[in-house]
Amino acid sequence: MKEQIEKLYEKYRRGRLKAVIICVIAYFAMMGVVNMFLGSPFPHKTQILFMETMANGWINTHGYLLILCGIIGIIVGMGSILYQIIHDFEKFDKILLEECDTKKYLELMEYAVSYGTEIKPKDFQKSVFTLAQQRYVLALMAEHCFPKAMAYLQNHWQGKKTTNLYRNTALSAQLVSSFENRNGEEFAGLYQKGEKLFRKNGIFLGKKLFLEGKYADAVELLQNIQKKTNYQEVQRQYMLAMCYEALKETEQASICMEYVAKYGNTTPCRYAAEQWKRENASVVLSETMIE
């Protein structure tokens, strides 16, 4: 996998040239579309009834379309390369999202950042490096290395810290860290600050309700979240287990912990689930016998 990281950086070493080529192709393609509706772009002879006359061409009559075609070409050229970079990262993200292997993912993203620093990225390699940094921080969070994640964001992040990518990553790190510390007041403030960002992830709202002591509401919310990735499902099941335990529903908590222990792979919550099962085995057994 490390070789694939190196190939990814090499692939976009001349990314700007690829973007220019795509931009030019898109530019002329857009001009072709305009030609279909407005005719030739250049001055030309045309015949109206029995008279021959000169037509200005749409470059003279609708010159703004030339600029518009150029803008669209630039957007398509740049956007296509950035889309390819994001798409290329998806095969690495599957290690976390589908395999739930947080240790392997962290090792890989750590190498991606280290290698990117070593080669001094140029051109679109800078975009690859920025996404590698973001995923490295997310990998640290997934491994519950919260102080290290915050330290990297504050002291070692290379690039602008005013971008949405940096701000959202930093906010996510602060939010997860505050939950780990069970700081309900801080968590609520951070959640409100980034509500639009976290609205699509019901697990964050479930954590907010948990810290507020609204365990039944959290259970109802978490039960209605549809599975998107294996990693999210493991996180959802673990949160449900925590809520059930708080509600003294040990048997339900045990079912959720069993799922986490089985599918959690190398995630920290898997080890926590296994420990919980060992510590509560007698309680679960007694409740089962009573029923």
Functional labels for PLM-detected ranges:
Residues 6-15, 39, 73-103:
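Transmembrane-cytosolic junction motif
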Residues 6-8, 105-114, 146-158, 182-195, ...:
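Alpha-helical repeat scaffolds
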Residues 17-40, 72:
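Canonical alpha-helical transmembrane segments of integral membrane proteins
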Residues 51-73:
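Hydrophobic alpha-helical transmembrane segments
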Residues 82-91, 125-135, 161-172, 194-204, ...:
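Generic helix N-cap/helix-start motif at coil->alpha-helix transitions
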Residues 82-127, 148:
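Membrane-proximal helical linkers
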Residues 94-98, 139, 173-180, 208-211, ...:
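Residue-level signature for tetratricopeptide repeat
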Residues 210-291:
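Long, non-transmembrane cytosolic or organellar matrix-exposed soluble domains/tails
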